[in-house]
Protein backbone atom coordinates (compact mmCIF):
# COMPACT_ATOMS: atom_id res chain seq x y z
CA UNK A 1 0.00 0.00 0.00
CA UNK A 2 1.42 3.36 -1.02
CA UNK A 3 0.55 6.47 0.92
CA UNK A 4 1.24 10.02 0.02
CA UNK A 5 1.23 13.07 2.22
CA UNK A 6 0.36 16.67 1.70
CA UNK A 7 -0.21 19.86 3.63
CA UNK A 8 -3.59 21.49 3.11
CA UNK A 9 -3.72 25.17 4.00
CA UNK A 10 -7.20 26.75 4.17
CA UNK A 11 -7.37 30.28 2.83
CA UNK A 12 -7.58 32.20 6.08
CA UNK A 13 -5.97 35.34 7.33
CA UNK A 14 -4.35 33.29 10.07
CA UNK A 15 -2.75 30.28 8.44
CA UNK A 16 -3.69 26.79 9.59
CA UNK A 17 -1.71 23.86 8.19
CA UNK A 18 -3.36 20.44 8.07
CA UNK A 19 -0.95 17.52 7.69
CA UNK A 20 -2.71 14.60 6.01
CA UNK A 21 -1.82 11.20 4.60
CA UNK A 22 -3.67 9.49 1.78
CA UNK A 23 -3.96 5.89 0.68
CA UNK A 24 -3.39 6.23 -3.06
CA UNK A 25 -5.21 2.97 -3.77
CA UNK A 26 -8.48 3.90 -2.06
CA UNK A 27 -8.11 7.67 -2.01
CA UNK A 28 -8.90 7.67 1.70
CA UNK A 29 -7.39 10.62 3.55
CA UNK A 30 -6.73 11.03 7.24
CA UNK A 31 -5.54 13.98 9.28
CA UNK A 32 -2.30 13.45 11.17
CA UNK A 33 -2.17 16.83 12.89
CA UNK A 34 -3.30 20.43 12.55
CA UNK A 35 -1.01 23.38 13.18
CA UNK A 36 -2.00 27.03 13.79
CA UNK A 37 0.93 28.13 11.64
CA UNK A 38 2.69 27.25 8.41
CA UNK A 39 4.48 23.94 7.99
CA UNK A 40 5.90 22.68 4.70
CA UNK A 41 7.25 19.72 2.77
CA UNK A 42 6.61 16.61 4.90
CA UNK A 43 8.92 13.75 3.90
CA UNK A 44 8.51 10.09 4.84
CA UNK A 45 11.52 8.42 6.41
CA UNK A 46 12.52 5.25 4.52
CA UNK A 47 11.13 3.03 7.30
CA UNK A 48 7.81 4.90 7.30
CA UNK A 49 8.02 5.69 11.01
CA UNK A 50 8.35 9.46 10.74
CA UNK A 51 7.29 12.47 8.74
CA UNK A 52 9.88 15.25 8.60
CA UNK A 53 8.77 18.80 7.84
CA UNK A 54 10.05 22.36 8.12
CA UNK A 55 8.52 25.28 9.94
CA UNK A 56 9.93 28.64 10.96
CA UNK A 57 13.33 27.77 9.54
CA UNK A 58 13.71 24.58 11.59
CA UNK A 59 13.11 20.86 11.00
CA UNK A 60 10.79 18.61 12.96
CA UNK A 61 9.79 14.96 12.93
CA UNK A 62 6.38 13.55 13.77
CA UNK A 63 5.04 10.00 13.98
CA UNK A 64 2.11 9.55 11.55
CA UNK A 65 0.69 6.67 13.60
CA UNK A 66 0.78 8.24 17.06
CA UNK A 67 1.24 11.98 16.58
CA UNK A 68 2.04 13.77 19.79
CA UNK A 69 4.27 16.78 20.09
CA UNK A 70 6.65 17.13 17.13
CA UNK A 71 10.31 16.55 17.90
CA UNK A 72 12.84 19.19 16.89
CA UNK A 73 15.75 17.97 14.78
CA UNK A 74 18.56 20.11 16.13
CA UNK A 75 20.57 21.71 13.33
CA UNK A 76 22.85 24.02 15.32
CA UNK A 77 23.43 27.25 13.36
CA UNK A 78 21.21 26.18 10.42
CA UNK A 79 17.96 27.83 11.47
CA UNK A 80 16.84 29.15 8.09
CA UNK A 81 15.88 25.85 6.52
CA UNK A 82 13.49 26.07 3.58
CA UNK A 83 11.21 23.38 2.16
CA UNK A 84 13.95 21.53 0.27
CA UNK A 85 15.17 18.68 2.47
CA UNK A 86 15.80 14.99 1.76
CA UNK A 87 16.50 11.93 3.92
CA UNK A 88 19.21 9.47 2.90
CA UNK A 89 18.12 6.00 1.76
CA UNK A 90 19.54 4.40 4.91
CA UNK A 91 17.68 6.91 7.08
CA UNK A 92 20.82 7.96 8.92
CA UNK A 93 21.29 11.45 7.49
CA UNK A 94 19.25 14.36 6.31
CA UNK A 95 20.29 16.94 3.73
CA UNK A 96 18.89 20.44 4.00
CA UNK A 97 18.76 23.71 2.12
CA UNK A 98 19.48 26.57 4.48
CA UNK A 99 19.69 30.31 3.89
CA UNK A 100 23.11 31.48 5.02
CA UNK A 101 23.42 34.56 7.20
CA UNK A 102 26.18 36.09 5.08
CA UNK A 103 24.16 36.63 1.91
CA UNK A 104 20.79 34.96 2.49
CA UNK A 105 21.38 32.46 -0.31
CA UNK A 106 20.29 28.88 0.06
CA UNK A 107 23.10 26.35 0.37
CA UNK A 108 23.04 22.60 0.95
CA UNK A 109 24.19 20.91 4.14
CA UNK A 110 24.03 17.41 5.61
CA UNK A 111 23.65 16.36 9.24
CA UNK A 112 22.76 13.24 11.23
CA UNK A 113 19.05 12.42 11.20
CA UNK A 114 18.98 12.62 15.00
CA UNK A 115 20.44 16.13 14.78
CA UNK A 116 23.90 17.65 14.92
CA UNK A 117 26.22 20.23 13.40
CA UNK A 118 25.57 20.66 9.66
CA UNK A 119 28.29 20.05 7.10
CA UNK A 120 28.40 22.48 4.17
CA UNK A 121 28.22 20.65 0.83
CA UNK A 122 27.67 23.43 -1.74
CA UNK A 123 29.85 26.50 -1.14
CA UNK A 124 28.10 28.25 -4.02
CA UNK A 125 24.55 29.55 -3.82
CA UNK A 126 21.73 29.60 -4.40
CA UNK A 127 21.42 25.80 -4.29
CA UNK A 128 18.13 24.00 -3.63
CA UNK A 129 18.29 20.33 -2.74
CA UNK A 130 15.83 17.80 -4.20
CA UNK A 131 17.41 14.35 -4.53
CA UNK A 132 19.78 11.89 -2.87
CA UNK A 133 21.04 8.90 -4.82
CA UNK A 134 20.01 5.46 -3.48
CA UNK A 135 23.65 4.50 -2.90
CA UNK A 136 24.12 7.63 -0.79
CA UNK A 137 26.98 8.98 -2.89
CA UNK A 138 25.41 11.89 -4.80
CA UNK A 139 23.06 14.80 -4.20
CA UNK A 140 20.96 16.34 -6.98
CA UNK A 141 19.78 19.92 -6.79
CA UNK A 142 18.66 23.01 -8.65
CA UNK A 143 21.13 25.88 -8.65
CA UNK A 144 21.50 29.28 -10.24
CA UNK A 145 24.88 29.85 -11.79
CA UNK A 146 25.51 32.72 -14.19
CA UNK A 147 21.84 33.69 -14.41
CA UNK A 148 20.30 30.32 -15.27
CA UNK A 149 18.72 27.68 -13.05
CA UNK A 150 19.87 24.15 -13.92
CA UNK A 151 20.16 20.67 -12.42
CA UNK A 152 23.47 19.85 -10.76
CA UNK A 153 24.91 16.90 -8.86
CA UNK A 154 27.65 16.84 -6.25
CA UNK A 155 29.27 14.15 -4.07
CA UNK A 156 27.32 13.80 -0.81
CA UNK A 157 30.56 14.34 1.11
CA UNK A 158 31.30 17.53 -0.83
CA UNK A 159 33.48 18.17 -3.85
CA UNK A 160 33.14 19.45 -7.38
CA UNK A 161 29.63 20.04 -8.67
CA UNK A 162 28.59 18.89 -12.15
CA UNK A 163 26.03 20.63 -14.31
CA UNK A 164 23.60 18.22 -16.00
CA UNK A 165 21.19 20.54 -17.85
CA UNK A 166 21.94 23.52 -20.07
CA UNK A 167 18.53 24.50 -21.51
CA UNK A 168 17.41 28.10 -21.21
CA UNK A 169 14.92 28.71 -18.43
CA UNK A 170 14.22 26.81 -15.25
CA UNK A 171 15.20 23.16 -14.74
CA UNK A 172 14.18 22.14 -11.23
CA UNK A 173 13.12 19.41 -8.81
CA UNK A 174 15.62 16.62 -9.60
CA UNK A 175 14.95 13.30 -7.86
CA UNK A 176 16.67 9.95 -8.34
CA UNK A 177 14.74 6.86 -9.34
CA UNK A 178 14.95 4.01 -6.78
CA UNK A 179 17.28 2.11 -9.10
CA UNK A 180 19.63 5.09 -9.25
CA UNK A 181 19.87 4.99 -13.03
CA UNK A 182 17.69 8.02 -13.72
CA UNK A 183 17.00 11.52 -12.47
CA UNK A 184 13.50 12.89 -12.90
CA UNK A 185 13.04 16.66 -13.00
CA UNK A 186 10.81 19.40 -14.36
CA UNK A 187 11.72 21.85 -17.09
CA UNK A 188 10.11 24.83 -18.81
CA UNK A 189 12.20 24.43 -21.96
CA UNK A 190 9.17 23.58 -24.16
CA UNK A 191 7.00 26.46 -22.95
CA UNK A 192 4.96 25.01 -20.09
CA UNK A 193 6.63 23.28 -17.17
CA UNK A 194 6.78 19.54 -17.93
CA UNK A 195 8.20 16.45 -16.27
CA UNK A 196 11.42 15.12 -17.80
CA UNK A 197 13.74 12.19 -17.19
CA UNK A 198 17.45 11.74 -17.87
CA UNK A 199 20.13 9.25 -17.05
CA UNK A 200 22.02 9.97 -13.85
CA UNK A 201 24.97 11.30 -15.89
CA UNK A 202 22.73 13.87 -17.62
CA UNK A 203 22.40 12.07 -20.94
CA UNK A 204 19.19 11.12 -22.78
CA UNK A 205 17.03 13.97 -21.49
CA UNK A 206 13.49 12.90 -22.38
CA UNK A 207 10.17 14.70 -21.96
CA UNK A 208 7.66 12.55 -20.01
CA UNK A 209 4.53 14.74 -19.78
CA UNK A 210 2.88 16.68 -22.60
CA UNK A 211 0.05 18.58 -20.94
CA UNK A 212 -0.95 21.66 -22.92
CA UNK A 213 -3.13 23.25 -20.24
CA UNK A 214 -1.26 22.67 -17.00
CA UNK A 215 2.24 23.05 -15.62
CA UNK A 216 3.74 19.85 -14.18
CA UNK A 217 6.12 20.20 -11.24
CA UNK A 218 8.26 18.17 -8.84
CA UNK A 219 8.05 14.48 -9.79
CA UNK A 220 8.34 11.98 -6.93
CA UNK A 221 8.89 8.31 -7.67
CA UNK A 222 7.24 5.50 -5.72
CA UNK A 223 9.58 3.15 -3.81
CA UNK A 224 9.02 0.35 -6.35
CA UNK A 225 9.77 2.72 -9.25
CA UNK A 226 6.46 1.97 -11.00
CA UNK A 227 4.62 5.25 -10.43
CA UNK A 228 5.34 8.94 -10.09
CA UNK A 229 3.40 11.68 -8.41
CA UNK A 230 3.72 15.35 -9.35
CA UNK A 231 2.00 18.72 -9.01
CA UNK A 232 -0.36 20.09 -11.65
CA UNK A 233 -0.95 23.83 -11.86
CA UNK A 234 -3.22 25.32 -14.52
CA UNK A 235 -1.56 27.96 -16.64
CA UNK A 236 -2.84 31.49 -16.35
Give short role names for the model-derived ranges.
Residues 1-236:
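Sequence signature of WD/YWTD-type beta-propeller architectures
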Amino acid sequence: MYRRFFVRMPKKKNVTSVLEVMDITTGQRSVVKEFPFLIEAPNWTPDGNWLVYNSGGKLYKLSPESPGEPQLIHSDYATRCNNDHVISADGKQIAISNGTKEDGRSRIYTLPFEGGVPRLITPLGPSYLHGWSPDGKQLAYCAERNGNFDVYVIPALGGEEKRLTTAEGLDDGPEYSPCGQYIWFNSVRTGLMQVWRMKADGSEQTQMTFDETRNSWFPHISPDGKQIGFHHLYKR
